[in-house]
C-alpha cells in the first residue's frame, strides 16, 4: 500500500487517481500508524515552503517521516521534493527535512535568459543523468509537467535528472530511499504514470 501523506497541502485527488489508474492501492492519511504500515510513501505539496513545513511540524509528522524514510521508499513531488532539502530561501530562510544536501533557491535570479517566465509552467524534457530503477519505464528526453518558481541547488551529487530552462533545473533527486521530482508525474500523462509505476516497484 502507498500512503499519500495528507498535511493540508497538495492536490491529493489527481495523485490518488493516477495510482488507481495503475491498479495500485493508495491511502490518503496523516495518521502515523498508516504511514508506518505503508510499503511506500508519497509527500505531495503545492504552495509555500515555510507554510508546508509548519503544517508538517504541527501534525507531528516530521519525526515519523525521518524514521520511515530510512525503511521504505519515499517520493516527494513538487513542493514535496523541495521539503526534502536542508534549507529553503522562499520568503525568508526555512529549515527543511534535511534528507537531500542543498538548498531551495529562487529560479528568477539564476536564469540565463531573463525573457523566460517565472514560474516555469508547462512541459519540459527531462534528461536522465544516470541509471536508476525509478527510470525503469522512462526514456531520456521524455516530457514532464512543471509548475515552480524555486528549484533545488548545490545538490549535484544527489541529482538524477535535470531539465533545461536556460540553466539545468533539478528535476529528480535521490538520497538513500528518498526520491524527489520537481515536476508533477500525476499531471505528466503516460510518462508520469510510468514513473509512478516504477516507484511502486522499488
Task: Annotate each language-model stretch with its function.
Residues 38:
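An anion/phosphate-binding loop that grips the pyrophosphate of nucleotide cofactors and donors
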Residues 103-202:
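Amide-donor transfer/coupling interface in amidating biosynthetic enzymes
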